[in-house]
Amino acid sequence: MDLQSLASSIPQDTLLVILAYALLGGLYLLVVPLALFFWMNSRWTRMGKIERLLVYGLVFLFFPGMVVFAPFLNFRLSGQGDN
């Protein structure tokens, strides 16, 4: 059974639901956490109290995606680790 016959045997509504789940999962696990990482990196020292509170809430909300990228991204403040 090839891929085209398998795809044609699945109803179109089911394929749309699978596509919607894939898009939402990609947003939740990949796109928003990466954007949040880079936002925090660029604004960390200039954030106000409310912005920091909102960022902490977003980190809590998107924690699974943040954990996916945490081992690969290292955003130390400049000057840290210099001897």
Swiss-Prot record:
Listed EC numbers: 7.1.1.-
Primary enzyme class: translocase
Location within or outside the cell: Cellular thylakoid membrane
UniProt cross-references to InterPro entries, sorted A to Z: NADH-quinone_OxRdatse_su_L
GO MF: oxidoreductase activity, acting on NAD(P)H, quinone or similar compound as acceptor; quinone binding
Topology term for the membrane: Multi-pass membrane protein
Record has rRNA-binding as a keyword: no
GO cellular component: plasma membrane-derived thylakoid membrane
Source organism superkingdom: Bacteria
Transmembrane portions of the chain: 18-38, 53-73
Keywords: Membrane, NAD, NADP, Plastoquinone, Quinone, Thylakoid, Translocase, Transmembrane, Transmembrane helix, Transport
Chief location category: membrane
Function per UniProt: NDH-1 shuttles electrons from an unknown electron donor, via FMN and iron-sulfur (Fe-S) centers, to quinones in the respiratory and/or the photosynthetic chain. The immediate electron acceptor for the enzyme in this species is believed to be plastoquinone. Couples the redox reaction to proton translocation, and thus conserves the redox energy in a proton gradient. Cyanobacterial NDH-1 also plays a role in inorganic carbon-concentration.
Recorded family membership: Belongs to the complex I NdhL subunit family.
SUBUNIT field: NDH-1 can be composed of about 15 different subunits; different subcomplexes with different compositions have been identified which probably have different functions.
Protein name, UniProt field: NAD(P)H-quinone oxidoreductase subunit L
Species for this entry: Parasynechococcus marenigrum (strain WH8102)
Gene name for this UniProt entry: ndhL
